[in-house]
UniProtKB/Swiss-Prot annotation:
Swiss-Prot/TrEMBL keywords: Cell membrane, Membrane, Transmembrane, Transmembrane helix
Membrane topology label: Multi-pass membrane protein
Compartments (UniProt record): Cell membrane
Entry's transmembrane regions: 40-60, 83-103, 129-149, 175-195
InterPro entries assigned: CASP/CASPL, CASP_dom
Name of protein: CASP-like protein 2U2
Organism for this UniProt entry: Sorghum bicolor (Sorghum)
Length: 208
């Protein structure tokens, strides 16, 4: 009886190497409902991170204000602060990366693909970790510069530039807020990729 069942599986082109199974824990299988939720959550967070990163980069890239100060016309741009340039670059990279990974998630959902193997899971997990730390670092640097621009620094005798460029600072603040939200999504994505990676080790499956 066992032999007949194996023969039928072979005839249908199904083998242990191509059956789409997902394992979690010592000997358990992830319920189908949970699997769908995890995939949907990952897709949503990657799309949200992409959109927020694009919005942050666009707001900063288009941010400029011209004022006349002491009879001298000056224009404030994001390129005047290296921290904002770094933030634009980081969000541009995060947007491109999230778009590619989001497309992979969408294809996986639509095709019901087999769970990725360990090397691929490690690669995705590592890239997600790098992007999460990268975006958080860029946000932290930009927020520090924004605080100096808003409140100045008595120790270094740096003046409050936002007093002169209120619209520029307001738009830059909105861009930083979007970047913060994008970085938080990247952190959530790294947690999901960690779940997808380490569950492959629970049952001894998915080694290759």
């Amino acid at each position: 009886m066992s032999h007949g069942h194996g023969g039928g599986a072979a005839d249908n082109g199904v083998s242990p190497g191509n059956v789409p199974v997902c394992y979690y824990g010592a000997a358990g299988r992830v319920p189908a409902a949970l699997e769908r939720r995890v995939r949907a959550a990952e897709l949503f967070m990657r799309c949200a991170a992409c959109g927020l990163a694009v919005l942050a980069a666009a707001l900063l890239g288009a941010d400029r204000q011209t004022r006349t100060i002491f009879s001298v016309e000056k224009t404030a741009r994001f390129t005047d602060m290296q921290s904002l340039v770094f933030l634009v670059i980081a969000n541009g990279m995060a947007a491109c990366y999230s778009l590619l990974q989001g497309a992979r998630c969408l294809v996986s959902i639509l095709t019901g693909g087999v769970l990725i193997n360990r090397p691929m899971a490690w690669a995705i997990f590592s890239c997600d970790q790098v992007m999460a730390y990268f975006t958080i670092t860029a946000v932290a640097v930009a927020m520090e510069a924004a605080m100096i621009g808003k409140y100045g620094s008595l120790q270094f005798q740096w003046m409050n530039t936002c007093h002169f460029y209120k619209r520029f600072c307001a738009q830059a603040g909105g861009a930083v807020a979007c970047a913060v939200a994008a970085s938080l999504n990247m952190v959530g994505i790294s947690l999901v990729s960690a779940f997808n990676l380490f569950r492959l080790y629970g049952s001894g499956k998915g080694r290759k």
